[in-house]
């Protein structure tokens, strides 16, 4: 999933951050480079999970994209009591901005996955909230764009325009055969032309 879409959604619908939302693929790298005022939010691409292929003649998998929203708050005490109350309010804002929202048409609505403390000190609290959204890899209709190598390869084949059929009937009473079965002589022929869209 494009995390820039998540950043834009949080900037638009979480006024508590006053636009202080950034993103990256690794929390340590983001924490060392993005120095925003607090409270601030950082969207981190956390990976994806894939189900097994569920069809025999194609590729179709359910993929769940995972991302974290890491909040960084100022803390006035080592216990984080005041920060815990603020985290409760900010979590509600994150839910309003993200849960049920579809980042693009191929995704199911975003779901909340839970939260956990990353770091606390006398000056700062860092807390992670996890979210996920699922989509299907592999198209449902041939008219949709190819998403896998197999679909791309099949799209390159010529259209199935028709077929020619030769029929050799089984003739178990033919005295020329030692065993019953087809004799190798074509008994009927026909062609089928298929209409093209």
Residue ranges: model-predicted function:
Residues 40-42, 85-150, 156-179:
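Acidic-leaning, charged glycine-interspersed low-complexity segments
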Residues 52, 78, 138-142:
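Intrinsically disordered, low-complexity acidic/polar segments
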Residues 60-77, 124-137:
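Oligomerization/assembly interface segments of phage tail-like spikes and tubes
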Residues 1-57, 81-88, 156-197:
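Small/polar-rich, solvent-exposed N-terminal microdomains that initiate assembly or binding
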Residues 3, 58-64, 72-102:
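Extracellular/virion structural assembly segments
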Residues 34, 58-60, 120-122:
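Sterically constrained small-residue positions within well-ordered secondary structures
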């Amino acid at each position: 999933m494009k995390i820039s879409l998540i950043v834009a959604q949080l900037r638009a619908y979480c006024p508590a951050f006053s636009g202080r939302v950034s993103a990256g693929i690794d929390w340590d790298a983001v924490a060392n480079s993005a120095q925003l005022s607090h409270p601030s939010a950082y969207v981190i691409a956390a990976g994806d999970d894939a189900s097994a292929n569920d069809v025999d003649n194609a590729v179709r998998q359910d993929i769940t994209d995972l991302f974290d929203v890491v909040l960084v708050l100022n803390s006035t005490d080592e216990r984080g009591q005041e920060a815990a109350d603020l985290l409760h309010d900010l979590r509600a804002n994150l839910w309003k901005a993200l849960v049920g929202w579809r980042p693009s048409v191929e995704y199911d609505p975003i779901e909340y996955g839970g939260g956990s403390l990353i770091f606390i000190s006398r000056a700062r609290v860092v807390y992670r909230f996890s979210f996920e959204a699922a989509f299907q890899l592999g198209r449902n209709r041939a008219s949709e764009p190819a998403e896998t190598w197999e679909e791309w390869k099949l799209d390159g084949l010529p259209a199935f325009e028709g077929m020619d059929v030769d029929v050799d009937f089984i003739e178990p009473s033919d005295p020329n055969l030692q065993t019953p079965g087809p004799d190798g002589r074509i008994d009927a022929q026909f062609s089928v032309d298929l209409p093209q869209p």
